[in-house]
């Protein structure tokens, strides 16, 4: 089989490192990045690409339109990219909006959102947890060892955080809704209690990490927290903390979104590349 031709567009540094990781699978063109190196072929203009791609890899999309953010504040539109794709091309990206999905699907392209893939979510837990640990070390005046840490939820990210903070010597507890999750946490050496009991427990924690994408910490709970408690919200927008109330109460809150790309862009890029490879293998491309 001939080597695949990839067109990687826009994004931050992890998109560049993803491009580098895809090199072993074929020839890789990069457009809209201010980074260069390795065997990745940089394109100053999209029209400089004189062959059509088998795979278009878009970054994590933030808007609701057809534009893709590039370095230097520039943008490229999906309508500019479709002419550079083979008819059988795969189009993949992160958090693809409905307009992009409909646009490429209408042209007959196979479309896949790598951000919805289970393997990417599992692998991203580690850099997310390490990012939370880094924030806790930078934003508090205490050691992680001996600190009292509360984690809300006990899904993949919460488990990774609990393992990491516990390994650093923190006294970790988790707030959960299901008794099965509480039992699992207790089996792993963690204190566990129900969300309904949060109000009574919250004053004793130095660091509180939220992983639940629903409102948890309202004004009442924020007010009950100790003065110097650090809140780290890892949940996707809109998060689980009343940020306006937190500001009014002078609470320390860090909304930590997209941590893998910020704290470990090389690893994050490799994870995306591995996920793209999985998609290609599954779809026989």
Where do the language-model regions lie?
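Short acidic-hydrophobic, aromatic-tinged amphipathic segments that line or gate anion-handling sites
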Residues: 42-49, 191-197
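Rossmann-fold NAD(P)-binding glycine/threonine-rich loop
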Residues: 95-114, 234-281
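Residues in the short beta-alpha loop(s) of Rossmann-like NAD(P)-binding domains
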Residues: 12, 34-35, 97, 177-179, ...
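Phosphate-coordination loops involved in phosphoryl transfer and adenosine-cofactor binding
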Residues: 2-5, 88, 145-148, 228
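Rossmann-like adenosine-cofactor binding region
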Residues: 61-64, 77-86, 187-261
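Glycine-rich adenosine-cofactor-binding loop
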Residues: 6-16, 22, 145-165
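Glycine/serine-rich phosphate-binding loop and adjoining beta1-alpha1 elements at the start
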Residues: 58-145, 275, 282
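NAD(P)-binding Rossmann-fold cofactor-contacting core
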Residues: 25-39, 168-188
């Amino acid at each position: 089989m001939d080597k695949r031709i990839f067109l990687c567009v826009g994004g931050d540094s992890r998109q560049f490192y993803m491009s580098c990781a895809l090199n072993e699978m074929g020839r890789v063109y990069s457009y809209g990045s201010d980074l260069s190196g390795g065997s990745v072929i940089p394109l100053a203009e999209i029209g400089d690409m004189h062959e059509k791609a088998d795979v278009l890899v878009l970054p994590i999309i933030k808007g609701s339109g057809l534009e893709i953010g590039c370095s230097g504040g520039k943008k490229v539109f999906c309508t500019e990219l479709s002419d550079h794709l083979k008819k059988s091309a795969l189009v993949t990206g992160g958090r693809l909006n409905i307009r992009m999905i409909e646009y490429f699907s209408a042209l007959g392209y196979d479309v896949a959102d790598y951000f919805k893939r289970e393997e990417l979510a599992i692998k991203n837990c580690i850099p997310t947890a390490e990012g939370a640990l880094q924030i806790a070390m930078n934003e508090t005046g205490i050691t992680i060892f001996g600190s009292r840490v509360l984690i809300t939820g006990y899904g993949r990210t919460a488990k990774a955080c609990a393992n990491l903070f516990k390994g650093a010597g923190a006294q970790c507890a988790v707030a959960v809704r299901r008794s099965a999750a509480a039992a699992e946490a207790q089996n792993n050496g963690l204190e566990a209690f129900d969300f309904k009991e949060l109000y009574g427990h919250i004053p004793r924690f130095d660091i509180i990490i939220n992983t639940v994408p629903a409102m948890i910490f309202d004004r009442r709970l924020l007010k009950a927290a100790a003065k110097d408690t650090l809140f780290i919200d890892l949940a996707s927008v809109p998060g689980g903390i009343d940020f306006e109330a937190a500001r009014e109460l002078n609470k320390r809150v860090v909304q930590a979104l997209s941590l893998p790309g910020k704290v470990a862009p090389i690893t994050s890029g490799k994870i995306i590349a591995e996920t793209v490879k999985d998609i290609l293998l599954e779809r026989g491309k």
